[in-house]
Structure formats: structure tokens, C-alpha cells
């Protein structure tokens, strides 16, 4: 996609909106959270500024370093921050780094399209840093300024040398008093930086970890074509990667896709290089265009007869991996909702539709073998969906209702309330724990479904086999929102679906099988934050007996130390191996009572990463899984690790 330079980037292009004091008081408002996610977000803010320079046609190389002290430096070869005096009476870099919303992307400033959609930028990074140093190469000189203690300038902007280069180097150390962790994860950064490199053809991003001499270079000549190939790397594909690009009413569009033999679709969309996780008008434009083009082609070559209904979009997109990347000028940019996760610009729909329609119709004509294969696959998907719909309707109309009710009646213990907004469904491993859960639950709003048999691995199985699996069928009926393309979040019977298993490897396996099913066939459940993992305690510490007995619980070895101090000498420790070892009262108190339980909400943070992990770890190819395990799993004699030790967890109170 063409990069364009349209505006001057100088002191006058820097516009100021408000002061910086609020950031340290409410960091979550600016970076989302103060856990590992927020910590890594600081890096993305600085990198996105460098990417904006590349987008504007300046520089094509960014170097990100994790230093030994967990400080971060980001070096680009853009124009360098403007170094003159700003109209506020301070050097411009000081304004950029100390005033919130001061930057070249506000107003029609230094950038035509900018990725800093959240618009907080360098000043917020400075506010949340122990120290930050900016080094600028511009106009033949090297300039430097240092800030400490949350963005206070300790030097003015100083000339420290001469240079023939241009660019900006930002070096900062996150403030440990602001973050729950200040240790950077190489893998987390590399996934996001890889994404930035995919989206800009020819951009080279280097990630260097000085703590352990790791280094990765991301550079993709084919841009989003390489991104699609990366998503499908471990899948069996049915076509080459196809890509289209074009411009329509000043909106630039990049679209690439490839089909695999799986059953789910995976579309990732971006606006000005920033992910739109909830889709929007650009996604709808691409979907509409694909549906129209495939139907027109199918009729033209008589794969669909006159009497046949048109293929639905979901049938056509079965097995599709696609990337949509649009660049929209600031004056046209509109989002729905606060989080900017969904594009609202109506012009984007017609731009994407026009470009994809025209080029896809041409592609199908020119590649008849591939086109016919894909249309036949869609027809098969349509037939399977129709059969599933009939089966569901028969179940609803009563022909098979008795059977579906029987499937549930022996297993599901329903909640007393009929209010889906309050009700919770516990999926419990095994009958004995299921029995305790039924006795211990709050009958008003908690339903319990014990899982007796083996849950099928839905990543490997065909749709027909999945519906033959009794456990999966029972779960589908209990949740009540349908399944696959017909799933509707509005029809579900519960506000929380809670997976409760033993704290051992078998329990973890059941969790993963259920999560794979929800991810593939009820993804909106996860996207809307309805899926949770219950955390039963690992230890019970007791002292005394009868009415004087003191009982405390610990969820981790760390917590155990505090509990032992609290109980005092003469204690007895019990290590729980399974839920069945707890009686109903204990299970209620530790794992089911909303006042005292701990739940882990399942979220999708990085869609591309999740897609690849599910394919690698749950798919039918053994080799990629073996390689991943060799690279990422340390085998030892230690007890299995606790889920609470995962650095990607963020903590929130239950409401």
C-alpha cells in the first residue's frame, strides 16, 4: 500500500489538549490496566508513534530493546521529533512528553492517517515511568532531554552532538510503584511487533532482549499476504493466499485471504494499523462483497441452479482466514462505543465492498478450479447447516423434545430463577464433585451440570461427530444459545459459564477441551466475558476439633505461608487433589460463593496468537505441537504450576 507524505511535521503541527496530572491517579483509563497488559501497552504506544512515521513515508526500520534492567528503548529512523520552541514556551519534545494529547496526530497535523487511535502516546508513557530519556537526531544535530519521577523534566533539551541521520530514540523504565509487574515478556512483545510488521510491507522491526541475548527480526515483503500464511501455517490449506488492494474515495484498502479445511472463520481487521477487535463497517463490506461474488459465480457456472437458494455468508466463510487493513483519513474516522474496537465509518463499507467485489469476481473467473472447489465446499457447509437446523427444529417442535429433555433431565440440576442475567452454570468434572456442588450451591441462581464422559476434541473432529458427543450435546442444550454460525448470545440461559475441575493435569485437560469447543463454536461467549474457570483451593489448614476447629484455605504456596502464621502452631495441612475431597459446605465457601470465591475470566487478547495456539496444541498435526512443547515447556520434578502464577492475569473485584 502506498505511503504518502502530505503534511509538515513541525512545531505548529503539535496541538495540545489537556494536562498530565490525571494519568498517575487513574492509569487504567489511559493504558487499560496496571498489570502485565498495561506494562506492555507502554511499548506499543511508543512503537505506534514510530510506525506513524513509517506510514507517512519516513524511515523503514524500528529497533526495540529490552535492557537488562527491564527498561525499554525504541529507536526509529523517522524525521525526529521537532526540536524548536513550542508556542507554550517550552521545547516541543517537552510538550510532546509532558502534556497529555499533545501530538502531531490531533487536528490535521503531521499525519494524514495515524495509528495512535487511543491518542495517549508518549506523554502517558513518561507519566508512568521512573525515568525517560529522549534522544533526537534532526537538522544535523543530536538533542537529548531526561525526565524522572513520572515525567518531570530534570534537564532542558540539550544539543549533545552532530549527526547526518534523523530519528528518535525513546528510552524509559516503567515505575514499579505504578505496575504490579515490571518484567517484560519477549514473546508478548514479539507477537504484537510481528503484527505491526505484517501490516506495513517492507517495514523492518527488530526486537532485541539483552537479558538473555534473544533477537527476532520481523520483515515481510508481502505484508498481509504473509500474515494470512502465518495464521494458516499449521492448517491444511485449499488455496493460495489471494490479496487485493486499492483506493476508493481516499480510503486505502488491503485485503488478503486463504481457505483451509477447518470449519471456523478467522477474520482480523485493522484501521490505520490498529486492531479493531469488534470488526465494523470495513469487515461488513468485505463479507457482503464475498457473499455476492461467490453467489454470482456459482450461478454463472450452474453450481447453483435457479431453484436453489443463495449461499449464506457463513457457509462461504467456513474455513476462511482473512486480513482486512484499511487506512482512513482522520476527518472520516468514526468508532462505535468507547473502546474504539469497532469501526463506524460508513464510507469504509462501500470502499471495501467496491474493491473486494471487483477484484474477487475477476479472481474467481481466472481461477476456475479453485473457485469451483470453494463453492462446492460452501454448498456442503450449507447442507450441513440445513441438516443441523432441521434437527434443532424437530427438537423444539416436540418430535425429539423428549430425547433432548431426557439428555438434560438426568444430568442438569437447574437453577430456581428463570433470570438469565443472574444465573450461573457450573460445568463440573465427575459425578462425586457434581454431587457436592449440587448440595452446596445456591439453588436460586446456580445450575450444575456434571460431566461424566469424555469431552471430544472439537479442533480435530468433524461437525457431525461433535454433535454425536453426548457431553457436548448436553452443554449445547443447557446453554441454550445454539451453536456455530447460528449461536446467539442473546438467547443464552446463563450470565456465567463456570468450568470447575480438579487442580490436576486431567482437570486442566478437561478445561482445555471445553475452552476449545467454546472458542470454535460459541466464540461470542468468550468475547462477551461469559466463560470462567473456578479456582478451588490447593490446601486446607485446620487446627482443633469440634466447635473450636479453625479452618483456613490457601490457593497457592505463597498464600500458604500467611495462612500458617494466622492459624498458629498445632495445625494440620490437607493437600486437595480433587474436588470430591471437599464436602458441600467447603465447596460452597471456597469455590461457589460469589462473596469468597476466585474466578478466572477467559479472554481473547491477541486473536492471531490464540488462533495459532489452538491449532498447534489441539489440531491433528503432531510435529508443530512437539516443537512448541520442546521450546516452551520446562520438564522437571516440580509440582504442576498454579494458574494464579500466570503473569497475564489481571485482577478485578467480582460485581
From Swiss-Prot:
Enzyme class: isomerase
Residue segments, region Disordered: 387-419
Composition skew (Basic and acidic residues), residue ranges: 387-397
Annotated positions binding Mg(2+) 1: 429, 502
Domain of life: Bacteria
Catalytic activity: ATP-dependent breakage, passage and rejoining of double-stranded DNA
Cofactor note as given: Binds two Mg(2+) per subunit. The magnesium ions form salt bridges with both the protein and the DNA. Can also accept other divalent metal cations, such as Mn(2+) or Ca(2+).
Site description Interaction with DNA, residues in chain: 454, 457, 509, 625
Positions bound to ATP: 9, 49, 76, 116-122, 340
Binding site for Mg(2+) 2: 502, 504
Annotated GO biological process: chromosome segregation; DNA topological change
InterPro entries: DNA_gyrase_B_C, HATPase_C_sf, ParE_type2, Ribosomal_Su5_D2-typ_SF, Ribsml_uS5_D2-typ_fold_subgr, Topo_IIA, Topo_IIA-like_dom_sf, Topo_IIA_B
EC number: 5.6.2.2
Annotated PROSITE patterns: TOPOISOMERASE_II (PS00177), TOPRIM (PS50880)
Co-factor requirement: Mg(2+); Mn(2+); Ca(2+)
One of the record's GO molecular function terms: DNA binding
Domain Toprim: 423-537
UniProtKB keywords: ATP-binding, DNA-binding, Isomerase, Magnesium, Metal-binding, Nucleotide-binding, Topoisomerase
Pfam families: DNA_gyraseB, DNA_gyraseB_C, HATPase_c, Toprim
GO (cellular component) term, any one: chromosome
Subunit structure: Heterotetramer composed of ParC and ParE.
Function summary: Topoisomerase IV is essential for chromosome segregation. It relaxes supercoiled DNA. Performs the decatenation events required during the replication of a circular DNA molecule.
Family: Belongs to the type II topoisomerase family. ParE type 2 subfamily.
Name this polypeptide is given: DNA topoisomerase 4 subunit B
Amino acid at each position: 500500500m502506498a505511503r504518502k507524505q502530505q503534511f509538515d511535521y513541525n512545531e505548529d503541527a503539535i496541538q495540545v489538549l489537556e494536562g498530565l496530572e490525571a494519568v498517575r491517579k487513574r492509569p487504567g483509563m489511559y493504558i487499560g490496566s496496571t498489570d502485565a497488559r498495561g506494562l506492555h501497552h507502554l511499548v506499543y504506544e511508543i512503537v505506534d508513534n514510530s510506525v506513524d512515521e513509517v506510514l507517512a513515508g519516513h524511515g523503514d526500520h524500528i529497533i526495540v530493546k529490552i535492557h537488562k534492567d527491564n527498561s525499554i528503548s525504541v529507536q526509529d529512523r523517522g524525521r525526529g521529533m521537532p526540536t524548536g520552541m513550542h508556542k507554550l514556551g517550552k521545547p516541543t519534545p517537552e510538550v510532546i512528553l509532558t502534556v497529555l494529547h499533545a501530538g502531531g496526530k490531533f487536528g490535521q497535523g503531521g499525519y494524514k492517517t495515524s495509528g495512535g487511535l487511543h491518542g495517549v502516546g508518549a506523554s502517558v508513557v513518561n507519566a508512568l515511568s521512573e525515568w525517560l530519556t529522549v534522544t533526537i537526531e534532526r537538522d544535523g544535530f543530536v538533542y537529548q532531554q531526561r525526565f524522572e519521577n513520572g515525567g518531570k523534566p530534570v534537564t532542558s533539551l540539550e544539543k549533545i552532538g552532530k549527526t547526518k541521520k534523523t530519528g528518535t530514540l525513546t528510552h524509559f523504565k516503567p515505575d514499579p510503584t505504578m505496575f504490579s509487574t515490571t518484567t517484560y515478556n519477549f514473546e508478548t512483545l514479539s507477537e504484537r511487533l510481528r503484527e505491526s510488521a505484517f501490516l506495513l510491507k517492507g517495514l523492518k522491526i527488530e526486537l532485541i532482549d539483552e537479558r538473555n541475548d534473544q533477537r527476532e527480526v520481523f520483515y515481510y515483503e508481502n505484508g498481509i499476504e504473509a500474515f494470512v500464511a502465518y495464521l494458516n501455517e499449521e492448517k491444511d490449506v485449499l488455496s493460495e493466499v489471494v490479496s487485493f488492494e486499492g483506493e476508493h474515495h481516499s480510503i486505502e484498502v488491503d485485503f488478503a485471504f486463504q481457505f483451509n479445511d477447518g470449519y471456523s472463520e478467522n477474520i482480523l481487521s485493522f484501521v490505520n494499523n490498529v486492531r479493531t477487535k469488534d470488526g465494523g463497517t470495513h469487515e461488513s463490506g468485505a463479507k457482503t462483497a464475498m457473499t455476492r461474488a461467490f453467489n454470482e459465480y456459482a450461478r454463472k457456472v450452474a453450481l447453483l441452479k435457479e431453484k436453489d437458494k443463495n449461499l449464506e455468508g457463513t457457509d462461504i466463510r467456513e474455513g476462511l482466514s482473512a486480513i482486512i487493513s484499511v487506512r482512513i483519513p482522520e476527518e472520516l474516522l468514526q468508532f462505535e462505543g468507547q473502546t474504539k474496537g469497532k469501526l463506524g465509518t460508513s464510507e469504509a463499507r462501500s470502499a471495501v465492498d467496491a474493491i473486494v467485489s471487483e477484484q474477487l469476481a475477476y479472481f474467481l473467473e481466472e481461477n476456475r478450479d479453485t473457485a469451483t472447489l470453494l463453492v462446492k465446499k460452501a454448498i456442503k457447509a450449507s447442507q450441513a447447516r440445513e441438516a443441523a437446523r432441521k434437527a434443532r427444529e424437530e427438537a423444539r417442535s416436540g418430535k425429539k423434545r423428549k430425547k433432548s429433555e431426557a439428555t438434560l433431565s438426568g444430568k442438569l440440576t437447574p437453577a430456581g430463577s428463570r433470570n438469565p442475567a443472574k444465573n450461573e452454570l457450573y460445568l463440573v468434572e465427575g459425578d462425586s464433585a457434581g454431587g457436592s456442588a449440587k448440595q452446596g450451591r445456591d439453588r436460586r441462581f446456580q445450575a450444575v451440570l456434571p460431566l461424566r464422559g469424555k469431552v471430544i476434541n472439537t479442533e480435530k473432529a468433524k461437525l457431525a461427530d461433535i454433535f454425536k458427543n453426548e457431553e457436548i450435546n448436553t452443554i449445547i442444550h443447557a446453554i441454550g444459545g445454539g451453536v456455530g454460525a447460528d449461536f446467539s448470545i442473546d438467547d443464552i440461559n446463563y450470565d456465567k459459564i463456570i468450568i470447575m475441575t480438579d487442580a490436576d493435569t486431567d482437570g486442566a485437560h478437561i478445561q482445555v477441551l471445553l475452552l476449545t469447543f467454546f472458542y470454535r463454536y460459541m466464540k461470542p461467549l468468550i468475547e462477551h466475558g461469559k466463560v470462567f474457570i473456578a479456582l478451588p483451593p490447593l490446601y486446607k489448614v485446620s487446627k482443633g476439633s469440634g466447635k473450636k476447629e479453625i479452618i483456613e484455605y490457601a490457593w497457592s504456596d505463597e498464600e500458604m505461608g500467611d495462612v500458617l502464621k494466622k492459624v498458629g502452631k498445632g495445625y494440620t495441612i490437607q493437600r486437595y487433589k480433587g474436588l470430591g475431597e471437599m464436602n458441600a459446605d467447603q465447596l460452597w465457601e471456597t469455590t461457589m460463593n460469589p462473596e469468597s470465591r476466585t474466578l478466572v475470566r477467559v479472554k481473547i487478547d491477541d486473536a492471531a496468537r490464540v488462533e495459532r495456539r489452538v491449532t498447534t496444541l489441539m489440531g491433528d498435526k503432531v510435529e508443530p505441537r512437539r516443537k512448541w512443547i520442546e521450546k516452551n515447556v520446562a520438564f522437571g520434578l516440580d509440582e504442576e504450576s498454579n494458574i494464579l502464577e500466570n503473569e497475564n492475569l489481571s485482577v478485578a473485584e467480582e460485581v
